[in-house]
Regions:
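An N-terminal assembly and electron-transfer interface module characteristic of large anaerobic redox
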Residues: 1-230
């Protein structure tokens, strides 16, 4: 962004209004950021960040990995949290077939419908930006992506969704991925580091590195591994 720190976004008169309908609010937010002037330069190298939910989003837990990526003149790409919060309604068929724990099908169908309705204004607003902003893949597509590499039955921790997010980033033109995880988070080592081999066979251009974030971990080693990957 040309000015830095999205200064133009602060000059939005709609912020002063007490209430806006949700679809209107979504459109105004996208419109404000879409209006930001951009530098006419080639796109920077993109580096994705996935991993354990706390380490992925909390800067103090991941030693400010987004700042590290941007300090290397790269673009950080962090998938949203909505998918993590809404996985259950989309895997009921698998759970019913293999575990017998599919639950109330009508209830989960209603939940899926409600989530789709909730996301619809956001998707419609982003669609008006002419491709400047990335649309997240729908949850059913993420389930299909994960099933190519691992089992949907891997549901501990971030489970199959972690694998799906890596595949989503690679297929959207971000083959460089940092998988951030606590040292002792075994489920994430299985669905993260454990899937690297198969992902690389499917996508030879994948450039994935696993970084352990722990109070006893060396920050110098973390920085070196990130820089070597880039």
């Amino acid at each position: 962004e040309h000015h830095g720190f999205s200064k133009t976004a602060a000059k939005t008169p709609w912020l002063k209004r007490r209430y806006l309908p949700y679809p209107v609010l979504a459109r105004e937010i996208v419109k404000s950021f879409d209006a930001l002037p951009l530098k006419d330069v080639p796109r920077k190298v993109r580096v994705g960040v996935v991993g354990e939910i706390l380490v992925k989003y909390q800067p103090d837990a991941n030693n400010h990995v987004v700042d590290v990526i941007e300090s290397q003149d790269c673009e950080a790409v962090v998938p949203g949290i909505m998918e993590f919060m809404t996985t259950r309604p989309y895997i009921t068929d698998w759970n019913e077939k293999y575990l017998g724990t599919g639950g109330n099908k009508t209830l989960y169908a209603l939940m899926r419908w409600s989530l789709d309705r909730y996301n619809a204004p956001i998707k419609a607003a982003i669609a008006t930006s002419h491709g400047k902003f990335k649309q997240d893949d729908p949850m059913p597509e993420l389930v299909e992506k994960a099933a190519e590499v691992t089992s949907i039955g891997v549901q501990a921790g971030e489970g199959w969704l972690l694998t799906a997010e890596i595949l989503e980033l690679i297929e959207q033109g971000c083959p460089n991925v940092i998988c951030a995880q606590p040292f002792a988070c075994l489920p994430n080592h299985v669905t993260g580091r454990g899937m690297f081999g198969k992902i690389r066979r499917l996508h030879p251009d994948a450039n994935i590195v696993s970084i352990d974030y722990d109070p006893g971990a060396s920050q110098a080693n973390q920085l070196n591994r990130i820089k070597l990957m880039i």
